[in-house]
């Protein structure tokens, strides 16, 4: 006989934890099932940089940033590019989410003990016009404690609810089907997997030791996206971005396999915008990998010169940190699936950060002493220097001819011509003498340094790339890094899932990445960053509160 509860949550990542704790706090019983072990509680969010999109925050105001709901919504709509009938609910979610980010989001988190690093980052800067893609102002608020710091309040609440008997975890329970009675989703069934104490993030076994069935008045799908499943990524790769990359690295663990998306779709849920994905172009292969094909994203400042595989500088405004999707489209149009940064030691010292909690021990460990060393150390942060020394994608040389020769050797071809690259670097270097120039990237550097946060810790003083005083020269081979699924199950503002016939499926909810972070694609085609964790928080909260009101 199936065990019964009020609500079942499929997935113990951030959105699932948020939904489950809201349900438990409302006095309802909830069971959280996940195919991974307890050590993976928090899912992808644990590995994140902990960035949150906030609007008109105290942190922004202290840095002299003037922001507003109206400006943020203008940026969001210009970035999303909503252009389909399917975008009706994503647009509603976008307006509601920006209001959340400009309203109670920060205070809600702060009441649970969440804290923010005081310097606000400026991600996805765009470079088009006021109504186009990008953040007009810095909005990327890093959680003090990075990914674990955003998971902790909800894990704590979940464990407290578990102690009181309102919440039950069922780890190593893999859902294989949703049960439906008279058109209402009322449970799940699947396989019990053998215990596996593998380290968090590493691939766990799929050995089946039993089966299970659970019944409830509502089921919330919080199972994540497809970023760990390269086959699915390639299947969904849009024609507008050219052929899918032959070589990709993974920004998420292997268990982010998209399996539950197929199971939920089979039950009649409407999946929309499946061709919209968010994959990074600044991926580097992890020299100390945790999961298969483990990649890390460089979070670059504005100064590195960016070249495609043939040695041609990327066109304006495709500079570091400007337009991820535009960069991906351009790179794939070259016929190659990689590109290059060329920079100096002075640039890497101040401008290279690595995404991920494990790559930022100072912020993750909440150590002010270690964090302050970023501004005072002679070298780059220790994890960056480790990649420079051990990473297969990094090349360090004193002379440009030696650097280019090594780049060709690493790529296994002869595409790069020294004179072509030297001409472009020297032309850029001539623009450095004045603070007013025509080179759009150099203008971008000067603009960045007008913001105190960038000037302090994220943007190097303008200098010539070929100036030996700022050497050695560094080249980084950049790979395509899989990450987020932007499409998902179509949901209303209560996270209730629509069926293929256009009506809500009773008893079924979807949250987080499985719901395109809200509505089936709250981001449209592009993200402003800091919005994925936020989408998990907002959609999970909405679903948990709505489901708690619905169940008896």
Regions found by a protein language model. Name each.
Residues 46-76:
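N-terminal glycine-rich dinucleotide-binding loop that anchors FAD/FMN and/or NAD(P) in oxidoreductases
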Residues 261-263, 267-409, 413-416, 420:
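An anion/pyrophosphate-binding glycine-rich loop and adjacent beta-alpha core
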Residues 413-518, 522, 526:
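A glycine-rich dinucleotide-binding beta-alpha-beta segment and adjacent secondary-structure elements
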Residues 2-15:
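Beta1/beta-strand and adjacent pyrophosphate-binding region of the FAD-binding site
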Residues 65-133, 399-427:
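Rossmann-like flavin
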Residues 25-46:
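Glycine-rich FAD pyrophosphate-binding loop
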Residues 196-287, 529, 533-542:
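Glycine-rich loop(s) and the adjacent beta-strand/alpha-helix scaffold that form part
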Residues 94-212, 230-233, 284, 425-469:
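Conserved redox-cofactor binding core of oxidoreductases
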């Amino acid at each position: 006989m199936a065990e019964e509860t009020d609500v079942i949550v499929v997935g113990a990542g951030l959105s699932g934890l948020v939904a489950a704790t809201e349900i438990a706090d409302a006095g309802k019983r909830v069971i959280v099932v996940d195919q991974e072990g307890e050590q993976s509680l928090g899912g992808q969010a644990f590995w994140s940089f902990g960035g949150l999109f906030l609007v008109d925050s105290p942190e922004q105001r202290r840095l002299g940033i003037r922001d507003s709901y109206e400006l943020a919504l203008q940026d969001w709509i210009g970035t999303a590019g909503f252009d389909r009938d399917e975008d009706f609910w994503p647009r509603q979610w976008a307006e509601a989410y920006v209001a959340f980010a400009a309203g109670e989001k920060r205070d809600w988190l702060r009441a649970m003990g969440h804290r923010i690093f005081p310097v606000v980052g400026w991600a996805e800067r765009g470079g088009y016009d006021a109504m186009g893609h990008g953040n007009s102002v810095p909005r990327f608020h890093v959680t003090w404690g990075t990914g674990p710091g955003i998971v902790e309040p909800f894990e704590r609440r979940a464990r407290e609810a578990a102690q009181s008997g309102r919440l039950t975890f069922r780890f190593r329970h893999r859902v294989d089907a949703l049960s439906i009675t008279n058109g209402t989703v009322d449970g799940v069934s699947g396989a019990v997997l053998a215990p596996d104490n593998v380290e968090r993030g590493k691939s766990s076994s799929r050995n089946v030791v039993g089966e299970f069935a659970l019944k409830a008045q509502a089921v919330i799908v919080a199972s994540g996206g497809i970023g760990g499943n390269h086959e699915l990524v390639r299947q969904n790769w849009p024609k507008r971005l050219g052929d899918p990359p032959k070589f990709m690295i993974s920004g998420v663990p292997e268990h982010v396999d998209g399996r539950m998306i197929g199971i939920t779709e089979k039950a009649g849920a409407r999946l929309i915008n499946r061709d919209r994905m968010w994959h990074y172009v600044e991926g580097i292969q992890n020299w100390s990998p945790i999961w298969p094909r483990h990649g890390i994203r460089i979070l670059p400042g504005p100064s590195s010169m960016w070249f495609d595989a043939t040695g041609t500088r990327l066109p304006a405004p495709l500079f570091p940190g400007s337009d991820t999707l535009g960069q991906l489209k351009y790179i794939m149009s070259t016929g190659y699936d990689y590109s290059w940064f060329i920079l100096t030691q002075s640039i890497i010292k101040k401008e290279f950060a690595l995404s991920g909690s494990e790559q930022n021990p100072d912020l993750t460990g909440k150590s002010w002493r270690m964090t302050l060393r970023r501004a005072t150390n002679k070298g780059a942060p220790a994890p960056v220097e480790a990649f420079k020394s051990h990473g297969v994608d990094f090349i360090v040389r004193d002379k440009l001819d030696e650097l280019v020769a090594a780049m060709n050797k690493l790529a296994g071809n002869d595409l790069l011509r020294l004179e072509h690259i030297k001409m472009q670097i020297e032309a850029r270097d001539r623009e450095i003498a004045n603070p007013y120039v025509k080179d759009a990237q150099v203008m971008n550097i000067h603009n960045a340094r007008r913001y105190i946060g960038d000037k302090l810790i994220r943007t190097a003083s303008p200098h010539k790339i070929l100036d030996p005083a700022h050497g050695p020269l560094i080249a980084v081979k950049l790979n395509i890094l899989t990450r987020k699924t932007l499409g998902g199950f179509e949901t209303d503002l209560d996270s209730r899932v629509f069926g293929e016939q256009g009506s809500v499926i009773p008893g079924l909810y979807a949250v987080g990445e499985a719901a395109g972070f809200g509505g089936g694609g709250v981001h449209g085609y592009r993200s402003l960053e800091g919005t994925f964790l936020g989408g998990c928080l907002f959609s999970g909260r909405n679903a948990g509160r709505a489901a708690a009101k619905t169940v008896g």
